[in-house]
């Protein structure tokens, strides 16, 4: 589940992740473009070769057979195939599995209401705080901000990810704007700042560990309790770990997608000082 990434959702659990083809965005820096852009870009046509027919029942059986605790819709943009996702989530929830979305967050209130009965968690990409940058991707900044607010308001566990791209969204001002917005929704929302690599049609240099650390420090200074740096395992110090915001003890130690220690398996409180840690731990 850390690969989604979710750091406060059943750490170390296996998640069966499914997806489809297509996206309502056309980001030139997409890291999943082979599946997300298949329907509009001939260069991504190989994505169609990954498709296989499977029923919701078979999906859930596969998850149970492999010891998964979660079923997650991801890879392309799940919002464009929400009916299909719900067909799977209904079966998964009945079988005792948790369900989650990994999305660009460009959702309407109607689809959020449709998904809410089945979802435990919702990961949303907050790509930039510049409206013109979102328009270049094919979306609207305000729609994404409203989705983050709504997902939190209706009780979904929300984690926000920003892919930090040199020259696109990595200015100090923009990182502050992003941090302050998330803080305005809830200081408990984890913010993942993740490293970009050159892909698809974008050729900026890769994000440095130093830049991720700087971004994380801004998030912490803005008041966020849980800030993580991702995609550079072993190079960002303790920013892969979950710390108690009160006593600062390490509660979940990670390296990349792997959980090394987890002190929240049986409790949602810090075993050292008793502070309740926001998340879905059991």
Model region roles, listed by residue range:
Residues 4-9, 24-29, 83-86, 90:
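Short flanking/linker segments adjacent to small metal-binding domains or redox-active Cys/His motifs
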Residues 1-20, 33-37, 240-241, 249-257:
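N-terminal [4Fe-4S]-dependent radical SAM core
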Residues 1-15, 54-74, 274-282:
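Short Fe-S-cluster ligation motifs
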Residues 6-8, 113, 261-262:
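Short secondary-structure boundary/capping segments
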Residues 167-168, 172-282:
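Auxiliary Fe-S-binding modules of radical SAM enzymes
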Residues 15-48, 256, 278-282:
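Canonical Radical SAM [4Fe-4S] cluster-binding loop centered on the CxxxCxxC motif
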Residues 51-211, 218:
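Conserved AdoMet/S-adenosylmethionine-binding subsite of the radical SAM
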Residues 40, 73, 102, 160-161, ...:
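Residue-level detector of family-conserved "landmark" positions at structurally sensitive sites
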């Amino acid at each position: 589940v850390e690969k989604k990434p979710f750091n406060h959702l059943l750490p170390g659990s296996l998640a069966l992740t499914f997806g489809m083809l297509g996206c309502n965005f056309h980001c030139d820096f997409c890291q999943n473009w082979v599946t997300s852009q298949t329907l509009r870009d001939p260069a991504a046509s190989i994505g169609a070769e990954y498709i296989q027919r499977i029923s919701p029942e078979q999906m859930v059986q596969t998850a149970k057979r492999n010891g998964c605790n979660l079923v997650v819709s991801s890879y392309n943009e799940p919002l464009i195939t929400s009916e299909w996702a719900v067909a799977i989530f209904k079966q998964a929830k009945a079988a005792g599995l948790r369900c989650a979305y990994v999305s660009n967050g460009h959702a309407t209130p109607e689809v959020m209401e449709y998904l809410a009965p089945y979802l435990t968690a919702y990961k949303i990409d907050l790509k930039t705080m510049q409206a013109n940058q979102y328009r270049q991707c094919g979306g609207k900044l305000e729609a994404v901000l409203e989705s983050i607010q709504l997902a939190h308001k209706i009780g979904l566990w929300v984690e926000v990810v920003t892919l930090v791209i040199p020259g696109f969204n990595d200015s100090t001002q923009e990182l502050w704007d992003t941090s302050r917005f998330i803080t305005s929704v809830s200081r408990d929302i984890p913010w993942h700042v993740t490293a970009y690599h050159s892909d698809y049609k974008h050729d900026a240099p890769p994000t440095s560990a130093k830049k991720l650390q700087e971004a994380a420090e801004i998030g912490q200074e803005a008041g966020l309790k849980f800030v993580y740096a991702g995609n550079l395992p072993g190079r960002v110090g303790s920013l892969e770990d979950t710390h108690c915001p009160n006593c600062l003890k390490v509660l979940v130690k990670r390296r990349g997608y792997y959980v090394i220690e987890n002190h929240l398996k049986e409790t949602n409180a810090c075993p050292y000082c008793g502070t309740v840690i926001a998340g879905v731990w059991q």
